[in-house]
């Protein structure tokens, strides 16, 4: 079915879309504990090309920390980080990193789970293989994975009213 859907898009679009989802394992492996899923991803995989909606990850050399945060990526022009105190993933104001714009996930694993589900939904949406009703249902399921309204930042990426 995907081949049929791809025929409606230019080769350039398809190549760019696929390129934005590439993750390549690095030749060296850094041992990271299982509860640090984002850190493991950043240090053990080349995420240079990975884009899911507006989300991208820092290179390992750009992953900085201070007493409050570990800065791990970007959502559009805003940095997102691991809040050390709680382990939550938060989106910060680029001008004032003490100001939390939104709470993105309760922990690192949940954040990655949310991104996977968002990308699956986005692909269905882009290729027109989902109805509005199914999209709403998918968004509800992602909200459940996200653990509720506190972590509903991703809803603004979809043309939805209320789920």
What are these regions (language model features)?
Residues 76, 85-86, 92-98, 140-144:
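Secondary-structure transition/turn motif
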Residues 92-126:
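Compact, glycine/acidic-enriched structural inserts
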Residues 1-86, 145-163:
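A surface-exposed partner-binding patch
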Residues 113-163:
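Mixed-charge (acidic/basic) macromolecular-recognition segments
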């Amino acid at each position: 079915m995907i081949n049929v859907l791809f025929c409606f898009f230019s080769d350039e679009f398809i190549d760019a879309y696929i390129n934005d989802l590439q993750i390549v394992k690095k030749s060296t492996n850094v041992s990271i504990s299982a509860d640090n899923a984002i850190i493991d991803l950043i240090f053990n995989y080349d995420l240079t090309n990975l884009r899911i909606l507006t989300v991208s990850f820092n290179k390992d050399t750009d992953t900085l920390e201070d007493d409050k945060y570990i800065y791990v990526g970007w959502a559009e022009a805003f940095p997102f980080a691991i809040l050390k105190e709680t382990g939550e993933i938060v989106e910060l104001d680029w001008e004032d990193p003490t100001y939390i714009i939104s709470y993105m996930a309760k922990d690192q694993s949940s954040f990655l789970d949310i991104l996977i589900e968002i990308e699956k939904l986005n692909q269905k949406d882009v290729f027109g293989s989902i109805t509005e009703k199914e999209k709403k249902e998918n968004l509800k399921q992602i909200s459940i994975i996200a653990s509720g309204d506190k972590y509903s930042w991703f809803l603004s990426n979809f043309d939805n009213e209320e789920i």
